[in-house]
Amino acid sequence: MSYLGVGLSPVNVAGTKMKLMDRKVRLTELILRCSVCALALVAAILIATDTQVKEIFTIQKKAKYTDMKALVFLVVVNGIAAAYSLLHMVRCVVGMMKGSVLFSKPLAWAIFSGDQAIAYLTVAGVAAAAQSAAFAKLGEPELQWMKICTIYGKFCNQVGEGIATALLASIGMVLISSISAFALFRLYGGNKAQQGSRW
């Protein structure tokens, strides 16, 4: 028994461990959301500001991200992911300040669904942009598509940096969606444990 007259019991210890784990999960989620917001914003800026002008036979041709629809999609998706992460960063900070650690099931479902949608969008954006970048770098001789990166080297390098940054943001979103899945299905796990203990 402690000096306050409150004895230690398995329930008290389990509750303390659960609160500590909840705090760590929330902090991890906040750090990941901050990282995704920053990385997605950097990726969108890198690609959207990328241009290069080359003179080919006295004709100036300007390469810009809007020339490849996959890059436009990647910029839009990263902008959405950055805004979504910023919104949830605020939710995480408010939740940590209030000290509320448990969600209602509808809110947990909404967060889980949103995180899944953004994770899928970011992965799709990176995949589409990587495929287009591979065509630009390697060309496609069967279709007589030439290698663009031999002409626009700086443009291709900056696009590559943007795609790599977007890949890191999409990995972060996949990790966040795993955390939201854990938070959602944990709400259902408690009921099963209580029902099982009745037997």
Swiss-Prot record:
Name used for this protein in its record: CASP-like protein 2B1
Family per similarity comment: Belongs to the Casparian strip membrane proteins (CASP) family.
Predominant location category: membrane
One Pfam family from the record: CASP_dom
Positions on the Cytoplasmic side per record topology: 1-26, 91-106, 186-199
Alphabetic keyword roster: Cell membrane, Membrane, Transmembrane, Transmembrane helix
Transmembrane segments: 27-47, 70-90, 107-127, 165-185
Source organism per UniProt: Eutrema halophilum (Salt cress)
